[in-house]
Amino acid sequence: MTSPSTSKASQVTIAILGGGSMGSAIARGLVTSGLCPASHISVADHNPSKLEALRSEVGVAISPKAKDILEASPDLCILAVKPQVLNNLIDEVGDALSGSLIVSIAAGVTLATLQEALGEGERIVRVMPNLPVAVRQGASAVAPGLWATENDVQLCLELFGALGSAAAMTEERLEVEGAVVGCAPAFFALLVDTLTRAAIDAGLPAAQARDLLNTTMGGVSSMLSQSQEHPRAYMERVTSPGGTTSAALHELEPLMAEGSFKAVEAALARACKLSQNG
């Protein structure tokens, strides 16, 4: 396996335009993974308090202006702003992005839209990460644009793979990944929240219930990842016929199944609307 000190990803300079939740999570994850030195990463955001906290934590360079961190012609530029303001950002920085590998994490903004805005010949890759990249347990989908090279794709896989797991796929599949995996942290947090409230209602103290459920969620995730056991098989293995888990699942599973399908459909519909508006 290639060590961080000799990998290509450890040598590249990276500009992250947007220091919100996801932009900060990527910067934090890349530095704490040991893959990228903090001196190779710059983050721009209009909110100085976000940037100061990030600089204090991991030591990356910061600036309130995107153009300032693009003056050094970074090897890779991550567009980490909301889809609704992406066009404004591109207008603001103009041709300063030219020559860099451009990575967009904006949901619903297609490669075709990005290519039209950035110009023919620009190397563009769409990546859909989720928030656990901040603790290097995230999941990211990678879809290359027309002029992105295989080396560009491999670089993105190495960078985002250091933040959890990363997979290359078509843009169509990336949209599905965004609707499922991209939204999944919120889904899982909702599950813990609702189970916590149910536990409180049944008599457990709030802090104790939340701690026990968070630990259980992490434990189940680790067991499934390590064993590669099918989730359905795992569920059946821990469910005794006629027991308490069986009774609980009888009530919960139909609601979760219907809700999950509707949630993914809603996320896909929203992504489609964003792409049309873009």
Annotate the PLM regions.
Residues T2, N214-G278:
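NAD(P)-dependent Rossmann-like dehydrogenase/reductase catalytic/cofactor-binding core
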Residues M1-P64, D68, A72, L76, ...:
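NAD(P)+-binding Rossmann beta1-loop-alpha1 motif at the extreme N-terminus of oxidoreductases
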Residues S42, P48-S49, V58, A66-V142:
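Rossmann-like NAD(P)(H) cofactor-binding subdomain of soluble oxidoreductases
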Residues S24, R28-T32, S56, D91, ...:
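Short, well-ordered alpha-helices that flank and scaffold nucleotide-derived cofactor binding pockets
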Residues P129-V133, G178-F187:
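Glycine/serine-rich anion-binding loops at beta->alpha junctions
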Residues A25, G108, L190-T194, G218, ...:
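A generic alpha-helix surface/boundary motif
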Residues T113-R123, A139-E177, F188-Q228, L268-L274:
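Internal alpha-helical scaffold of NAD(P)-dependent oxidoreductase catalytic cores
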